[in-house]
Amino acid sequence: RWLQIDFSAVVQGYAEKTESEVAPDKIVSLFQSHYLETQNPYQLISYELSRKDGEDSLVVDLTYGSTRLQLEGHAAGVVGAFVNAMQSHSGSEIVLVEYSEHTLSQEAGADAEAVTYVQLNINGQRYCGVGLSTDILEASLRAILSAINQPLNAEI
């Protein structure tokens, strides 16, 4: 429901800007451009995960514009470790508010695409993100970056 509320504002804004009804194919396009194609300024390159004594350590390679970064975070879960890494790097207060995931395919198997939805509170403002991948961890990291990129893209 929280993502529907967030996205409805995007669709409403487009409808008001164009002063027209929004066609179904345009709604799909708006969703893709707002949540799935927000790969700037942060973009995921790779990640490495390790676990010891119940704590996950995550090393992520990212680009921020044309700058390559390697960040590390630690927490009692992969998502928490990534939020920790991004918070330490950015200096922003980042809190995971909502998290949901599911497969997009009815078929089981290694090639099933997963989607992850997140809502983050970044410095007191809420932003939603969506990530897609055949790797559920990668989908989660992409969703977090999608949300983090939202306010940064608004500034550009």
Protein language model regions, located:
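Terminal or standalone catalytic/regulatory effector modules within metabolic enzymes
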Residues: 1-156
